[in-house]
Amino acid sequence: AYERQFYPGATSVAENNIGH
């Protein structure tokens, strides 16, 4: 999730919360 936080469209809702 951390490396994908720059690509919100590729993250799930849960990962998006972790990334941001």
Curated annotation (Swiss-Prot):
Its cofactor is coenzyme F430. It is an enzyme of class 2 (transferase). Coiled coil: none annotated. GO terms for molecular function: coenzyme-B sulfoethylthiotransferase activity. Keywords: Cytoplasm, Methanogenesis, Transferase. Its EC number is 2.8.4.1. It catalyses: coenzyme B + methyl-coenzyme M = methane + coenzyme M-coenzyme B heterodisulfide. Its main location: cytoplasm. It is found in: Cytoplasm. Pathway: One-carbon metabolism; methyl-coenzyme M reduction; methane from methyl-coenzyme M: step 1/1. It comes from the Archaea. One of its GO terms (biological process) is methanogenesis. Residues 1-20 are annotated as: Disordered. One of its GO terms (cellular component) is cytoplasm. Binds 1 coenzyme F430 non-covalently per MCR heterotrimeric complex. Coenzyme F430 is a yellow nickel porphinoid. Methyl-coenzyme-M reductase is activated when the enzyme-bound coenzyme F430 is reduced, probably to the Ni(I) oxidation state. Belongs to the methyl-coenzyme M reductase gamma subunit family. MCR from M.thermophila is a heterotrimer composed of an alpha, a beta, and a gamma subunit. Component of the methyl-coenzyme M reductase (MCR) I that catalyzes the reductive cleavage of methyl-coenzyme M (CoM-S-CH3 or 2-(methylthio)ethanesulfonate) using coenzyme B (CoB or 7-mercaptoheptanoylthreonine phosphate) as reductant which results in the production of methane and the mixed heterodisulfide of CoB and CoM (CoM-S-S-CoB). This is the final step in methanogenesis. This is Methyl-coenzyme M reductase subunit gamma.
